[in-house]
């Protein structure tokens, strides 16, 4: 347990574990935050310098710096010029007040039944928290804390006007979206907004399969029947859509999830024509998933931009990929013809995103920080994609594996030739400490077989240094899965 001369007696009650699936900087952040909440690290305590703490803990300076920046962004620490980081005053617990009791120990699990620790996180929802702009975000929030006390009062349920204006301008420039700020609604997550939208929809909804299971669940939970329609090389099948009774179509045209297909301009025009044949009785929900991360080609304009502000398209997007899932800010552009119904149903609702977070994002966008941040992310993620692709092509022979979905988003598909059963691949992934999904996991009908043996590999949270080892581990688990299935 490290202790530092010249500072308050400080120690970590939880040792850092390099073998854990939780990154070291997050382990350090959690441990220090717990000490501050408990009052062990008292208000006004000056934290050790980054190099000194890094040496004490045998970790990199970047690990300590990231943990400190996370603590500062969340208000645990304050940074003073030439004085380093200090524990915030208001964190001290009143005398006599005890911190919350630690949760009871979990029920013991027999070692033979315990899942091996995850060593390679290739899940599709991961992002790299090390790319989060901690310094800029913390500075903008600090400025707001001192200059905008009105943010403590209730705001517009649709979202703060400044953020809706900033989003309207950003979307017009970078996604071709045509809307007024009045058409924008801000909420705590895409699923939340979709749930509010569902009661306004005119009938059954077509959803893609393979596709996003949460979208189907949210729609059905809110009384909208879903029709699961197939995806081909150009996206949702228009033949299947035209033959269905769907009045709504939920699509991910910029980066179909999970296949990675981009819907071409011709298919987009056909989809808009499908909706235009029944004005006011058909709508398209455009989930602009991963449109920010297009590495090798220019993005097509949004469907909403093609249809216009008066068109039948509801545009959905979120900051969970471009910033972080914990930011919990998503937004929706409503067609003008739905504004009246929205206001009538939700005018007494309260907003679900804090005003400080909204104003911070507004300033982050209008100050030009967001576009620079995205450029930095694209560079980092493209390099990581290239490293993972190179690792896969080194570990697998060309006749063993086909890669797809490489040009957009933060995941790719790896289709095995003559694959073992998906159940064997799942078991082997668990055994070898790999967190990933299979394309069949996103089959919403439960009947498709063409997706068998296709791994869906996310690289958003995969450290650059682990790409080569990840390729080798994937080769081992595929070999083990094949051997296990051959013995059955």
What would you call each of these model-derived segments?
Residues 1-142, 149-152, 337-338, 343, ...:
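N-terminal basic, amphipathic alpha-helical segments
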Residues 82, 306-342:
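Active-site PLP attachment segment
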Residues 127, 254-256, 321:
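Short glycine-rich anion-binding loops that position phosphate/pyrophosphate groups of nucleotides
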Residues 141, 148-280, 292, 296-310, ...:
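Conserved core of the PLP fold type I
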Residues 225, 283, 434-435:
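Residue-level detector of anion-binding/catalytic polar loops
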